[in-house]
């Protein structure tokens, strides 16, 4: 009796063990929780279904197609294609894809939506040249960090740079991919015969940006070497080595930290050429952000006054690391803020980074000056400057002026202080200062206590700051003569 009972218990244990060792329940994995289709009718999106058994799908809604409609055990790629463009101003919900997992007797819904064919805003970051390529790649990496499911939202973020050589350029889009949960680089086009110093090539890049990413509004960032209004070398010797010029003008001192001032000689545009390019485009950029040195120069900005609405720029050198793109990109696509607020936040983020976080990047310095120019106010500023030029003069020492470039040849002096020191008519000087406030609002003038210059290799104190420079006080040739040929000087004297 005892033996029979033991045998029955053993059999029960064996049956229980067998039950525990039965095949596990079939599993299915779907790589996305939602599908976001491009706004036009030519793109597509894809996701993968990985399953232990057969599955099928159905979909409801309109404006898209799905293939294939079923799969077996293993991994299957499913492609979702829009069948028409989204002509609305915002995303539209197209429908739902439902995955039917027969073995598991479960259904999985995936919502499908489509971006607008015309983006709310397209921003192009144009970074020509090769000398700063390491920093350009770091800038792109920072943008990738900023791109999420919400940023740029229904906007488009494009980049054009020269990762291979001076004779080629590549344009790509940085876009969030729901299937991977990361920012992806989408190649748009390659330019095989490209010269950043050739106006027609640059114009083509800007035109293509609108063709590949049409938008209601456009923004432009130019990140490269900058020398304000100083004429480009255009393939000839730079001015710093021409006979009769001061040899140190564009030569950094030994051991200087890298800034965005020097390099890529022979691949430069004059500011007048850039203005002509922008004026000729079939689109208009609302703003231009210069991630370049010295571009907050009145001689420079006056040439651009009818080409864009706003310019963000620095009166001094910008460290080679450039703007903190992970911090400014969210503001560029902030649909809840007006444009002036967005641009103020860009200025503030630039200053904050160089004021407090500059040492998070090797080879950096606590040096960041920035301002916002309201371009529609520059003609009125020129009119006030004509009154200054005609008014009584008062003597001052040029050494009193706040300058923004190291070395023996300073070149760039604070415009507001120059007028305050040189104008002998208090009423005229006050009227000029009032117009300066409209053209360069105080609330968008930011600076660190000092600025770094590679031309003397050190930090230089800032005691007076209006956010914009002039080269009129410069006496060194040929710059003194060249300055008198600028449109700003001719309009104000």
PLM regions and their residue ranges:
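N-terminal extension/subdomain marker
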Residues: 116-215
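Surface-exposed loop and adjacent secondary-structure segments within mature catalytic domains
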Residues: 162-188, 222-265
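Solvent-exposed loop/turn segments at secondary-structure junctions
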Residues: 129-132, 163-167, 193-194, 224-230, ...
